[in-house]
């Protein structure tokens, strides 16, 4: 089964949340009393359990539970994330289901978190059948961990299951090759310039990029 290839710990919620799914968000503050997040053994895409969100107030703009940056990743590498989601028939027409993905350095504190944004397709309204949400992420040059966090808004009952995170083979090398080719072209153009200061500045950016990845050029150019 593909779930056994998932890099996530507890991808099908067959075990307790403790130590695997612990990063809960309730927005705005104060809506927690009308919401709940729990494992559910009455609804499942595969196995016995799923993750169940109940949202009882329309004031909610986000309820979510994430892995809290426990999944180790390689820098400059592509990963695919897929999950299955469904809702109760009574779920509001305005309800939305999406996936938040974040990256961080070695120490997962707020000062180290970046690229913590919604990724992939968004489901809107009731979803009577299990429906896939899929996203890809290309990790930054200094990324070490990711957070996977299914999120909802609107009232109703929402279930998640079968969350798969896998590396996309070969894509990182292909992207690196393309970036290096572009940098080589820039290097050649820089070498043809006559103005020493301008030439040196661009040459320095190119060399930095080759050593540290394309993000170094973006940062140095800002």
Question: Where does each model-flagged region fall?
Answer:
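Extracellular carbohydrate recognition
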Residues: 129, 142, 151-167
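Extra-cytoplasmic beta-strand recognition segments
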Residues: 11-17, 51, 55-57, 61-96, ...
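Extracellular recognition modules
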Residues: 82-84, 147-151
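Extracellular glycan-recognition surfaces and repeat-rich motifs
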Residues: 13-53
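Beta-strand acidic-aromatic groove motif in beta-rich domains, primarily in extracellular
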Residues: 23-25, 61-67, 90-104, 145-148
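Extracellular carbohydrate recognition and processing domains
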Residues: 106-143, 158
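Beta-rich interaction/scaffold domains
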Residues: 1-6, 170-222
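Surface-exposed coil/turn segments at beta-strand junctions on protein surfaces, enriched
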Residues: 44-46, 74-76, 90, 125-130, ...
């Amino acid at each position: 089964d593909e779930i056994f290839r998932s890099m996530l710990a507890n991808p099908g919620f067959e075990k307790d949340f403790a130590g695997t799914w612990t990063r809960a968000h309730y927005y705005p503050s104060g809506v927690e009393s009308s919401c709940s997040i729990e494992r559910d053994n009455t609804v499942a895409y595969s196995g016995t359990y799923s993750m169940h969100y109940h949202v009882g107030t329309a004031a909610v703009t986000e309820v979510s539970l994430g892995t809290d940056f426990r999944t180790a990743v390689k820098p400059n590498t592509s990963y695919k994330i897929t999950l299955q989601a469904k809702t109760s028939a009574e779920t509001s027409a305005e309800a939305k289901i999406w996936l938040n993905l974040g990256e961080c350095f070695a120490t997962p504190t707020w000062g180290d978190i970046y690229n913590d944004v919604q990724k992939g397709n968004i489901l809107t309204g009731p979803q009577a059948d299990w429906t896939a949400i899929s996203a890809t992420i290309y990790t930054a040059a200094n990324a070490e961990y990711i957070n996977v966090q299914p999120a909802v808004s609107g009232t109703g009952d929402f279930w998640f299951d079968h969350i798969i995170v896998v590396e996309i083979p070969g894509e990182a090398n292909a992207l690196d090759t393309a970036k290096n080719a572009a940098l080589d072209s820039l290097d050649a153009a820089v070498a043809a310039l006559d103005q020493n200061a301008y030439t040196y500045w661009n040459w320095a950016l190119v060399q930095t990029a080759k050593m540290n990845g394309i993000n170094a050029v973006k940062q140095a150019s800002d």
